[in-house]
């Protein structure tokens, strides 16, 4: 953890900090809902194992699992995120194109590498919206991302109105770039360092094509093959209809990822991506059968980190200043030495 120059807008007064967190969350989700025409729904904390509903994220993270006594010890998994569950829910609620849902998602990611931005506990707004086949293009993706970013800019101004010491720093315009273009721009840097470099330059960036193979044969970052479409043609005929939204954090002096989102796979993209990853056996799972049988709507969706968003607006150096979680003792000690008080 860096010994950083931190804003004292809220000082160490927990009462004002908790009020700030509450107001940010209420204001932002109201703006998100109205921007994208989303209805709030209640989401599960866990789902049955073996249904293909839980998300695999990068494909290697272990889900927290437990047996259910009344179901003959059938296994349940605490969710990683709700990408596939939301799409099933859109079908169940018969949501029309142009409308969608959002939810408060709480998850446990036991394999997370803990640090300033990463916790065992994940809280985010998970959202999903029904689209048409004509919407499955990069221009529509950019339109939706721009609307989400507009809600972020408005929220930052609300924080400034509440706490004038916290000056707005977000640029009015979001910069779009494909992961391949980013690689060519900074060929000698690793993917995370490319993110830091481009974010420092523009302040707010959306990187398209997360999960697709770049010209060097590597991926910018991993994605599970069965929710985001990262292989269909997108920006400048490069593959990918998904991406990550990143902001430059002036406190940590690095980029932070606030949202991961994308146009979801249709049948063709699902088959293509499962084959590419050698995971065609997933087609036997419940979610995948529903998709292949045309009983799920086309959709776009993503997640927006609640704690990270609050951390950014309130100029905090560690996510543990926003949320309660478990941290290594040496991390707590180091934070305390730098006047960073973890909840």
Which ranges hold each PLM region?
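A translation/RNA-centric and nucleic-acid-associated enzymatic feature enriched
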Residues: 108, 179-343
């Amino acid at each position: 953890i860096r010994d950083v120059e931190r804003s004292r807008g809220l000082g160490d007064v927990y009462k004002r900090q908790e009020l700030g967190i509450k107001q940010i969350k209420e204001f932002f989700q109201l703006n998100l809902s109205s921007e994208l025409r989303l209805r709030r729904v209640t989401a599960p904390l866990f789902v049955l194992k073996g249904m293909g509903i839980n998300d695999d994220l990068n494909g290697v993270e272990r889900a927290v699992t437990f047996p259910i006594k009344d179901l003959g010890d059938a296994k349940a998994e605490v969710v990683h995120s709700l990408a596939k569950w939301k799409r099933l829910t859109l079908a169940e609620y018969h949501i029309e194109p142009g409308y969608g849902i959002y939810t408060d998602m709480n998850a446990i990611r036991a394999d997370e590498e803990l640090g300033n931005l990463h916790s065992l506990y994940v809280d985010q707004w998970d959202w999903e919206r029904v689209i048409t086949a004509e919407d499955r293009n990069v221009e529509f993706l950019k339109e939706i991302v721009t609307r989400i970013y507009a809600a972020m800019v408005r929220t930052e101004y609300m924080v400034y109105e509440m706490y004038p010491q916290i000056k707005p720093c977000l640029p009015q315009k979001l910069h779009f770039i494909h992961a391949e273009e980013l690689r060519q721009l900074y060929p000698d840097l690793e993917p995370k360092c490319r993110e830091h470099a481009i974010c420092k330059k523009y302040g707010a960036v959306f990187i398209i094509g997360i999960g697709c193979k770049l010209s060097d044969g590597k991926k910018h970052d991993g994605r599970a093959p069965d929710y985001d479409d990262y292989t269909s043609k997108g920006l400048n005929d490069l593959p990918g209809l998904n991406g990550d939204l990143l902001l430059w954090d002036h406190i940590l002096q690095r980029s932070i990822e606030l949202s991961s989102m994308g146009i979801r796979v249709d049948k063709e993209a699902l088959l293509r991506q499962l084959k590419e990853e050698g995971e065609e056996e997933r087609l036997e799972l419940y979610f995948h059968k529903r998709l292949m049988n045309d009983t799920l709507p086309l959709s776009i969706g993503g997640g927006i980190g609640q704690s990270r968003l609050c951390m950014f607006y309130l100029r905090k150096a560690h996510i543990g200043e926003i949320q309660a979680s478990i941290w290594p003792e040496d991390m707590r000690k180091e934070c305390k030495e730098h006047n960073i008080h973890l909840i």
